[in-house]
Amino acid sequence: EAHEGVYSRLGQEVIAAFLQNRSLHTLYLSGTPYNIQRMFDTREVFHWDYTMEQQAKQQWTSLHPNTTNPYEGLAQMNILTYDISDKMRSLTKADGLNFAELFRTETTVDNTSRFVHEADVRKFITLIGKDSNDKTQPYANAYLQPSLNHTLWYVPGVMAAKSLAEILGEDSPTNPFSEYTIVNVAGNGEAGSDRLDIYEQTRFERSALERVKTAVTQHDKTITLSCGRLTMGVSIPEWNAVLMLA
């Protein structure tokens, strides 16, 4: 199974051992090949993606009648987009709401982090929350809301995740997410550091994964905040939606 680890010392040693046996052919299998594609010529790549999978699922019965559809259990993904530019005018550009600016942070005199546009962040949280006046918003939508008990929110950066976790975790009647357990796995940016080898990066990933698994097991509603961690090579069945806020 090929991932970023093929570039590590251990990965190179394993590959070198295989190459010593010249009668072998090497097949790299990966579900997240984004960072290793440059290792191969386009003629050496077989591509099978989500769209192909769903097409095979839909066509199986007509092409292979009276046989079990091996793709039947693979979920269909629904992508929803929301235009809230009229409600967040001060942070909206020609191509839509600028999440990087909305969630921009600054360091205060006491060395803590806070949102530069905190009032707008709180406005946004209220807008998408369960009590929103706009009932098309995800957590205010009677059809969608029951499916959003455990979600992943992808935010622009580590400090944005930290500051957002503090706001979402407030025990306040004005907080539409007060009944959710907030799991911030963005950390301090350590897993993305070039100074850490693959062993250390894996350790951070496993720790984050265990925290999420514990939370979804012990709590009815959770929100996981991440700026990259647990977004590749990880399956958490309880997650049934991702909010892309970056």
In which residue ranges do the predicted regions lie?
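Short glycine-/polar-rich loops that comprise or flank the Walker A/P-loop
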Residues: N21-H25, G73-M77, S178-Y180, P237-A241
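Conserved C-terminal RecA-like helicase domain
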Residues: E101-S226
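SF2 helicase catalytic motif II
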Residues: E1-Y28, T32-P33
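Interdomain helical connector at the RecA1-RecA2 junction of SF1/SF2 helicase-like NTPases
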Residues: H25, Q37-L152, A165
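Switch/connector loops and helix/strand junctions flanking conserved nucleotide-binding motifs
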Residues: E4-V6, N35-F40, M88-L91, A191-D194, ...
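Conserved catalytic network of the ASCE P-loop NTPase/AAA+ motor domain
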Residues: A17-S23, P70-G73, Y143-P146, T214-H219, ...
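A short beta-strand element within the Helicase C-terminal
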Residues: T222-S226, M232-A246
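A short beta-strand-to-loop transition that corresponds to the Sensor-1 phosphate-sensing loop
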Residues: L29-P33, D83, G157, S226-R229
